[in-house]
Each structure stands twice: as C-alpha cells, then as structure tokens.
Amino acid sequence: LNEDMISYEGEIKQIPNTIEAFGKREGKVNEQRPTTYEEGPWMYKRNNLYYLFFAAGPISEHIGYSTSKSITGPWEYKGIVMPTQGGSFTNHPGIIDFKGKSYFFYHNAALPGGTGFTRSVCVEELKFNKDGSIVQMNMTEGIKKSLTPLNPYAKTEAETIAWSEGVKSMKNKVVGNFITAKYNDAYTKVKEV
C-alpha cells in the first residue's frame, strides 16, 4: 500500500484459507468452508509480529486472529479474541494505537432496536500477553474512563460526535472535512476521547 493509502505496488497476494491459518470450523462439516474465516479481515503489526483479525464462524460470528512474522505468511491461527455475544449475528474488528495503548473496535446490537443490521460500534482496550498472544475479551458497555476531554473550541482532526441532530458532513479545500447544521436548531454533542 502506498503513502496515499489508495494505490499499491506489486501483485495482490492471497492468503490460503487453510485450517493452520484460520482454525477448523466447528459444527456441521462443509467441505467448501473448512475454516473459521468468514469475512472482514483487519491487518495489524506490533513488535515485528503481524496480526490478522477476522470475523469467524460459523454464524453467529466471533472474532478470531492469526499471526505471522511476515505479512505474506505463513499464518498460524491463534484462537478467539472475542466470543459470540451481543445479539448481532455478525461482528467485525478494527484495531488502532492511540496515546500508548491499543484499542479494539467491534460492533454489537446493544442499542435500542439493535439487530444484525442495525449495529452499534463499541471499543475495548486490547491487551497482549508477554508472548504476543491476545488476552481474550468479552463485550462490555465500553470504556468507562476517558483518556482526555475534548476542547469544543479547538479544531479536532476528526468529526467526533457522541450524538447529533440535523447535521451533515461536508468537505472543502480550505477546511477539509467538517460538520454543518442543516437547520437552525441542529446540534452535536461532544464527549471525551
């Protein structure tokens, strides 16, 4: 992947969908789908080790992960990061590093009216064992203590909204991305990070 995060150099490499790479699927035998891999992969690198997180089955999904010393493999299935929970038949991971900690994003159906298609985004701190393996986690109500408050009068390089009514995002060459009101009594509620 190039610096522009859109284009790439070289050939696309396919990761073989093997039991060694993704673990053996439990339940009814399906020769076309012998592994736990379903969809939604997320690549992450930490301390010279590559992690491949993915939605794993059978449905209802859990989050599994594999590791490799090379981005092209071979990959070794390491187990479950997050078991099937939360009322949604599906789950997809995303991992970031922020202010010295790693965070694991996922979704569930915890909000009122939530289902497999009306999901809510959640975040947990991602913790590692000394050997690089991941500490399995459960879905929770989220991180209780914020890292830092947001200053509503300073430019924040992301449209951070805990709740909004009557706003939309726009973009221009001077400011970049921003949110704007669609009518006079529109608002956003800003919470902590």
Residue ranges and their predicted role:
Residues 1-192:
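Carbohydrate-active catalytic/glycan-binding domains of CAZyme proteins
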